[in-house]
C-alpha cells in the first residue's frame, strides 16, 4: 500500500519514498535534538507559534490553518467532518483517501475517474462532465498526482473548483508535493483560500523537508471549515518535536530552491537513463517518476542490490510492470540505473 518498507529488508538505497533528496536540513536536526529537552513538559495544545508562522507565509490568519499528525490524520478528520454519501477519487492516486473515506463513512459510494495511460495519466476536461453527472459530496485531487508526478493544469483546476463551488461539492486539493516542483507561488490555492467556500488545501512538511518520522501536516481553509475539522482531531496532536521542527523548517527557503534544482536535474537524468534501458517513462513535474517495463519482478530483483523501489501494481488503475522511483542524489541515481542495467542484461 505504501513505500518505505525498510524494516523487513536490508536496504541501502530507498527509492520507494518520495522525500527530498537533500535530506533533513542540519538546523532542523539540531532543533529535533533540542526538542528532547522539552519532552518532560506539556506542549502548546494550540501550537500557536507554528500556526502564526505558517499562516504568515500565505497572508492568512492562524485560525485558517489546521495542523495534524501528518496529512493522513487530516484526511481522516476531513472524512469524519463531512461523512460523505458519495465521494469522487482519481485513479491511480494516493490510496489513503479511500482508506479514510471507508473508515469514516463505510456506506459511502466511491466513484472513480480513471486517468488514462494514453494521456500519460494527465487529468482531462471530461472530469467536469463526470462531476456534473455524479454530483459527489467530496472530491479529492492531488497536484502533482501520485504516483505519476504530473501537475494538474491550473486552468482546468480552476474550472473544476468553480463547478464544485456551484454544486456544493467539497474539494480537497492535496499539495503535499507541490513545493518540490518549484511552482508553489503560481499554483497553490492556499494563497487565495478566502475566495472559496468549500476548498481545503492539504500540505505537509514530511516530503518537503525529509522528515516523515516527525509527522506534521496542515490544512488551509476558511475558518468555519477549519473549526469543523478541528472537532475531529485529538487534543495535543502535534508533538514537541513536530512543533519545533515545523517552525524551524519555515525559515529555510534557500534549502527549497536548492532542492528544486537537484530534483529537476535528477529527474532529467533518471528519466533519460530509464528510457535508454527500454522502459516507458511517463512525464513528471515532481520528485518521483512512474515508469513501465516488462520485468514483472523488478522490485524483487533490485532487493538483491539492497535497493527498494515502489511496485505500483496495487494502485487502482495500474497493473504489474508499473514502478515508481524517487529522485535522489546523483550518485544514488547512478547506482539505481547501474543495478537495473545489470538486471536487464542478465
Segment roles from a protein language model:
Residues 80-141:
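PLP-dependent aminotransferase-like
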Residues 274-305:
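Conserved PLP-binding catalytic core of the aspartate aminotransferase-like
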Residues 104, 134, 166-167, 196, ...:
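Helix C-cap/helix->beta junction micro-motif
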Residues 304-305, 316-346:
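PLP-dependent enzyme catalytic core of the Aspartate aminotransferase-like
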Residues 1-41, 134-135, 169:
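N-terminal "arm"/small-domain region of PLP-dependent enzymes with the aminotransferase-like
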Residues 43, 55-77:
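Short loop-beta-helix segment that forms the pyridoxal 5′-phosphate
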Residues 23-28, 46, 96, 198-282:
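PLP-dependent aminotransferase class I/II
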Residues 118-181:
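Active-site phosphate-binding strand-loop segment of PLP-dependent enzymes
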Amino acid at each position: 500500500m505504501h513505500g518505505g518498507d525498510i524494516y523487513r529488508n536490508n536496504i541501502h538505497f530507498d527509492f520507494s519514498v518520495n522525500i527530498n533528496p537533500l535530506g533533513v536540513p542540519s538546523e532542523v536536526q539540531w532543533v529535533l535534538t533540542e526538542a528532547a529537552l522539552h519532552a518532560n513538559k506539556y506542549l502548546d495544545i494550540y501550537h500557536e507559534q507554528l500556526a502564526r508562522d505558517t499562516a504568515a507565509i500565505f497572508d492568512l490568519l492562524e485560525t485558517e490553518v489546521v495542523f495534524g499528525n501528518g496529512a493522513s490524520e487530516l484526511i481522516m478528520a476531513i472524512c469524519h467532518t463531512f461523512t460523505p454519501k458519495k465521494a469522487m477519487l482519481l485513479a491511480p492516486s494516493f490510496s489513503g483517501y479511500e482508506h479514510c473515506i471507508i473508515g469514516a463513512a463505510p456506506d459511502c459510494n466511491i466513484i472513480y475517474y480513471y486517468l488514462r495511460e494514453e494521456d500519460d495519466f494527465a487529468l482531462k476536461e471530461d472530469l467536469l462532465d463526470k462531476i456534473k453527472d455524479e454530483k459527489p459530496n467530496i472530491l479529492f485531487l492531488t497536484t502533482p498526482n501520485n504516483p505519476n508526478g504530473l501537475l494538474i493544469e491550473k486552468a482546468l483546476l480552476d474550472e473544476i473548483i468553480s463547478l464544485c463551488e456551484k454544486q456544493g461539492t467539497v474539494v480537497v486539493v492535496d499539495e503535499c508535493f507541490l513545493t518540490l516542483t518549484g511552482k508553489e507561488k503560481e499554483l497553490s490555492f492556499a494563497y487565495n483560500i478566502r475566495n472559496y467556500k468549500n476548498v481545503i488545501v492539504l500540505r505537509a512538511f514530511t516530503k518537503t523537508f525529509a522528515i516523515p518520522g516527525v509527522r506534521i501536516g496542515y490544512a488551509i481553509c476558511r475558518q468555519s471549515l477549519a473549526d469543523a475539522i478541528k472537532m475531529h482531531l485529538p487534543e495535543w496532536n502535534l508533538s514537541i518535536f513536530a512543533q519545533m521542527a515545523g517552525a524551524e523548517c519555515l525559515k529555510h527557503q534557500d534549502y527549497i530552491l536548492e532542492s528544486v534544482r537537484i530534483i529537476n536535474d535528477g529527474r532529467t537524468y533518471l528519466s533519460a537513463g530509464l528510457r535508454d534501458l527500454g522502459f516507458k517513462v511517463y512525464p513528471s513535474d515532481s520528485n518521483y517518476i512512474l515508469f513501465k517495463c516488462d520485468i514483472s519482478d523488478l522490485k524483487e530483483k533490485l532487493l538483491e542490490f539492497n535497493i527498494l523501489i515502489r511496485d505500483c501494481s496495487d494502485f487502482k488503475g495500474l497493473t504489474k510492470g508499473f514502478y515508481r522511483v524517487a529522485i535522489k542524489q546523483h550518485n544514488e541515481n547512478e547506482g539505481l540505473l547501474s543495478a537495473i542495467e545489470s538486471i536487464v542484461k542478465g
